């Protein structure tokens, strides 16, 4: 069990969709993968960073935080060139446990203009929050990153570019859910699982779809015509939807 605990502490990251919601509301902290040498791992078990407020970390940990921000900037420059992160207003501060610490804030810089991360979009904050974990997943064979609704708030084309890079060269494992169909255009069919309407068999691999086919079109065709082991979607009637819209629009007009 100690091996599993060690793996969970250092090589497994799970980012639920509630983190994205809290980031959008600027209410909470998010887990950030801090790259530390093996010799220091026993003292450092992970960190929660406030992306929209001030942080206080120990003096021993601060250099690793600064290195992580540098890592994120390298990736962000490739994804969104006009945005860089900066550690702002760092100074010595006594921590609650009586040890020496450093207080700092993380801000974004656009065209030499400093902007509090508070005012960035939810999509930008989400990208920043998972960047360090993506770096670890890309470079470490033992690393597993699990992200709920990876597509939430992220530009569709950028999502596809990120997935293409991870599929081709990542050493670790990335597991994610998505409502967006863009991943179907990028990922090989062998890497895809589809949700069904059957609670007893919620996830299936598709049948009769080869990697040479347009997976997105094949998926949409399966929704309309069937052909998979399970039903993928409860069919909706467009005419009933139109009628419902008209009826709803009349509520209260003649009351």
Regions found by a protein language model. Name each.
Residues 152-156:
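Conserved D-loop-proximal element of ABC-family nucleotide-binding domains
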Residues 1-129, 225-231, 254-255:
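Phosphate-coordinating catalytic segments in nucleotide- and nucleic-acid-processing enzymes
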Residues 144-146, 175:
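Structural motif
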Residues 148-150:
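Walker B catalytic acidic pair
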Residues 133-143:
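Short basic/glycine-enriched coil/helix segment immediately N-terminal to the Walker B
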Residues 128-133, 164:
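Contiguous, well-ordered alpha-helical segments that form the cores/surfaces of helical PPI scaffolds
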Residues 161-255:
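C-terminal lobe/lid and adjacent interdomain/linker elements of RecA-like ASCE P-loop ATPase modules
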Residues 103, 125, 142, 171, ...:
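Active-site lining segments that contact anionic ligands and/or coordinate catalytic metals
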